[in-house]
Regions:
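S-adenosyl-L-methionine-dependent nucleic acid methyltransferase catalytic domains
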Residues: 1-272
Length: 272
């Protein structure tokens, strides 16, 4: 939250020069894991997963590689601290899920809860749909940074939120491309009731959003953004960008909601 607030304040400075927000979370998590559970690879991984499953109120499941726990009739996968959850991971989970059905503790599972620190692009839309087509209900759930804080863990102040779903309309006229947010759906199971009651329109969930109009599978470049401030609560929901050259581009939209979670969506664009 502090980093997000600092970014908005920097953007509010007139004639501010370009800057980069470096995400060092992976290294921080690696240090935390070593401090909490030690350096011996396999025991550390088991202890880490057990810790996460306990926070998630899930039971440990033995005998599987990609499925680590069971909660309320659903399997649970715990992502590692240093790698995002990607499509191939989900493919392995589904294959193991099918082999596990009808065996022991996994006899009545309904789907898979995938806990992760980071997720590859379009997991909530594309990969979730692919899993559904394969007959498996998959939920992607972000591991909150608060698990790194002993005080928050001891007080039980840990909330796991499912990834939101972002709907975007992209329209092109020659070299002008308009990107418009059309919906933002936040799963409400674990959202505080006072927050839910305060939201009157889907856009109320959004605090900040930005666009990289030419994403090249590397770093997200903040080429345009709209965000709320204390004085100005208005949020622009569409923008038009003019490309200098025709070609195939990937537009990436990043949204940060009022809960502090980020959602990213990639859209292919053909400019004539």
């Amino acid at each position: 939250f502090a980093i997000h607030t600092a970014r908005k304040r920097l953007l509010g400075i007139e004639n501010i020069k370009p800057f980069v927000v470096q995400n060092l979370g992976k290294y921080e998590r690696q240090v935390w894991q070593a401090a909490e559970f030690g350096d011996n690879a396999e025991p550390v991984l088991r202890a880490y997963r057990g810790f996460m499953l306990d926070l998630y109120h899930a039971d440990i499941l033995e005998g599987y590689v990609w499925l680590h726990g069971v909660k309320a009739g659903r399997m649970v996968h715990v992502g590692t601290v240093d790698s995002p959850v990607v499509r191939a991971d989900v493919t392995h989970m589904i294959a193991e899920f099918r082999r596990a059905i009808g065996a022991g503790s996994a006899a009545r599972v309904k789907g898979i809860d995938v806990l992760g620190w980071d997720f590859a692009l379009d997991m909530q839309e594309t990969v979730k749909q692919e899993a559904a087509a394969a007959g498996v209900d998959v939920k992607f759930i972000r591991i909150p940074r608060e698990v790194l804080e002993k005080k928050a863990v001891d007080q039980g102040d840990i909330r796991f939120f499912e990834l939101a779903a972002l709907a975007v309309e992209v329209r092109g006229v020659k070299r002008d491309v308009t990107v418009e947010l059309s919906d933002f759906m936040v799963p409400r199971d674990d959202v505080p009731q006072d927050v839910i009651h305060a939201v009157k329109h889907w856009a109320d969930w959004i605090d900040y959003w930005a666009i990289d109009f030419n994403y090249r599978d590397d770093t997200f470049h903040n080429e345009w953004q709209s965000y709320r401030t204390r004085r100005d609560r208005a949020l622009q929901l569409s923008v038009t960008h003019a490309y200098h050259e025709p070609g195939d581009y990937t537009v990436v939209i990043k949204v940060i909601d009022i809960l502090g979670n980020d959602t990213t969506k990639a859209v292919p664009v053909k400019v004539r």
